């Protein structure tokens, strides 16, 4: 049994290393007070060269658009929709047979919120996104996030 486990060990190590290499996007999260009880939540994607992430504005028959779901929080009220800040590219994609909007390098997704009571809280949720390069697309991912809002800082 021990020999069997040892014979498969290199395979598992290779698979683990390969899985880590196939994560060409890094997410960071922050909150910025803009005035009084208003804040901006920043969910920023930094992509490795040649990779891109799709806009939130993609038709249903295309790739998976980037989307955000925020957990309910009685201390927070969203103000508008998530906006995109970055260099948006628009290009016809022959694989999907349509014009697509996407971002390379970096994109900052911003949600404005109002803090109803001046106490610290966490805004939690999940991001769903899909990334591609010129050779392949990775399966859609769901990534949980948590952003601390503290009116005292």
List where the protein language model places each region.
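Bacterial Sec-dependent N-terminal signal peptides
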Residues: 1-22
């Amino acid at each position: 049994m021990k020999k069997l486990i040892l014979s498969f060990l290199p395979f598992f190590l290779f698979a683990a290393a390969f899985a880590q290499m196939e994560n060409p996007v890094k997410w960071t999260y922050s909150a910025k007070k803009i005035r009084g009880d208003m804040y901006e939540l920043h969910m920023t994607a930094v992509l490795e060269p040649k990779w891109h992430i799709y806009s939130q504005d993609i038709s249903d028959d295309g790739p998976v658009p980037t989307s955000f779901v925020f957990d309910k929080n009685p201390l927070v009220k969203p103000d508008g929709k998530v906006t995109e800040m970055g260099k948006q590219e628009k290009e016809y994609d022959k694989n999907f047979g349509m014009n697509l909007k996407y971002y390379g390098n970096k994109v900052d997704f911003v949600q404005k919120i109002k803090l109803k009571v001046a106490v610290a809280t966490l805004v939690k949720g999940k991001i769903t996104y899909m990334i591609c390069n010129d050779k392949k697309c990775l399966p859609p991912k769901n990534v949980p996030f948590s952003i601390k809002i503290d009116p005292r800082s």
